[in-house]
Structure formats: C-alpha cells, structure tokens
Amino acid sequence: MILYKTSDLSYEIDSRTIFSNLDFEIASNEIYEIRGDNGSGKSSLLKILSGLNKMDNVYYDENLESNIAYLGHKNGFVEEISLRDNFNIIGAHVNDSLFKKFGLSKLKNHKFFNLSFGEKRKSALVRVIS
C-alpha cells in the first residue's frame, strides 16, 4: 500500500533551492533512510511529509493524517518548571503508563532543566505521541 507519493516536488527557502524534482513513493511496511549534508533539506522534507509544510504535489493516504507526528530539533519545554507541569500547561493528559514505558515516571516532578539530554528527548517524544 502506498502511503505517500510525490511528483516533481521542489522546495525553496528565501529563493534558495533546497531540493527539486523529487519523485518517490513510500509504501507501508518498508523502512526508509533520509540522508544528506547539513542544509540539504532532510528536515524540510519530513515537515512536508508530516503536513507541517503544505505542498500541492504530495499525495498521501488520508487515514494517516491523524497518526503522523513530527519531533523537530527543539524540545519546546519550559526549563524552569517540572516535567508534569510542562504537560499540564499544554493540556496534554499523559497517563502514567506512557511515562513508565519511556522511563520517565520518577522524573515527573523534576524541573525540566535537571533532565539529561536523552530524558528531554524522550519527554518530547511522549508529548508528540500523546
């Protein structure tokens, strides 16, 4: 089953061509790797595929839209408050089993700035999938 299909996909930022004339399909049950130098458009492509940047020539299975999340480079948490409070201020109600699954249960009441880089990334992942 084809999940995504692009046709002559091109993308520019500030009149600079990031990529052009991309034609590809992404099928279910396959693993893909996106590789390239810094600034080559990897994140831009993922933003397009996740729907953050809308493009006319990207076609996707409409059933996917509510199941797609994008975790960018920045965590987007308030450093001075607890992990739990960070989730509360955005209205995300995360059940304890998800915190436990990611090894964050004991850290819910810790200030975000005290978490390790990996714990912060796990927290960001929990936020996008909750």
What are these regions (language model features)?
Residues 4-6, 19-21:
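Conserved structural motif at the start of ABC-family nucleotide-binding domains
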Residues 22-33:
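Pre-Walker A (P-loop) beta-loop-beta motif of ABC nucleotide-binding domains
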Residues 33, 120-128:
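ABC ATPase nucleotide-binding domain "signature" region
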Residues 35-37:
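The feature captures the beta-strand-to-loop junction immediately N-terminal to the Walker
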Residues 50:
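Helix-to-loop junction immediately C-terminal to a conserved catalytic motif
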Residues 74, 79-95:
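Q-loop/switch helix immediately C-terminal to the Walker
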Residues 95-107:
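Conserved ABC ATPase "signature" region
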Residues 111-120:
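Conserved ABC ATPase signature
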